[in-house]
Amino acid sequence: FGGVYSAKRLQKLEPNSFDIELISNNNYFIFQPLLPEVASGTIPAGDAVTPIRQMLPKIKFRHAEITKINCHQKNVVVVQGMRRREHLIDFDHLVIALGQESNKQIIPGLKHHCFTMRTLEDAYNIRNHLIGCFELADVTLDKKLKRKLLNIVVVGGGFSGVETTGELKEMSDRLLPYYKNIKKNELKFHIVEFSSRLLPELSKEISDYTYKIFKKRDINVYLKTALSNVSINKIFLSNGKSIDTKTIISTIGSTVSKIINESGLPLKNGKIITNEYLEVEG
């Protein structure tokens, strides 16, 4: 959001007075809150995506990946094109809006065994994976395998976790009639939240309402519960319970971009230190 909307404001300036360039490794802007709907098929991907050049017709756009920020030299290193050649881009002023990255290191095993919901590719991967689980569960004679295939675990009860759980539950309910060997009570959704309620960012009334809706839809809610470990076919919870599963979707844990970490910029708790105008001093 930050980079695109900063450029959107800047393009209102006199175009001949400034040379404004936006660099991104995607040539489209994606509205992340809609990714769960894309994953579930509720909306087409086009409803969540807008081409950047269409949004910013007056801005020079470069489809490239930034690999390094050289603050003292006042340039950035990018790789672009099919051959991924390095280029140096000089700047007078730099707006950094790289966002954060998923931190899969916070739980042992999470990095190797979970999905995330941050990109369009993530949404497609989760959708295709779930359909694959249904296909195999419909034909397998192995009851233990079937249970793992039909246990869906979402880690994190914030906005993304709740939306992901709700959308994928709706998608699964729509799929069930087409898989004759899968009974409704065999499909189980689980959401794990460390705090005492779902959607802790919102009011208690909304949290309680969401909890009631989830329980009504037979979604297992684990509150005041954390993951302690993750394996290829199982998660272990802090309450001593474990869940056999082939599907773990993590919506928790963010960390500062590696590029920011290596930039030499002043950081505190993984965030760039700025003044009240969001300027880095020094």
Features from the language model and the residues they span:
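Beta1-alpha1 glycine-rich phosphate/pyrophosphate-binding loop at the start
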Residues: 1-68, 159-202
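Short acidic/His/Gly/Ser-rich catalytic and metal-binding motifs that mark active-site loops
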Residues: 29-32, 103-106, 258-259
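Short glycine-enriched, charge-decorated loop/helix-capping segments at active-site entrances
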Residues: 35-41, 111-115, 206, 264-265
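A conserved beta-strand/loop element that lines the FAD pocket in flavoprotein oxidoreductases
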Residues: 57-70, 215-230
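FAD-binding core/adjacent interface of flavoenzyme oxidoreductases
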Residues: 60-153, 171, 249
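Short glycine-rich anion-binding loops that position phosphate/pyrophosphate groups of nucleotides
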Residues: 99-102, 165, 254-255
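Predominantly flavin-linked oxidoreductase catalytic cores and closely associated redox partners
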Residues: 112, 117-213, 217, 221-223
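FAD-site-proximal beta/loop scaffold in flavoenzymes
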Residues: 113-142, 242-282
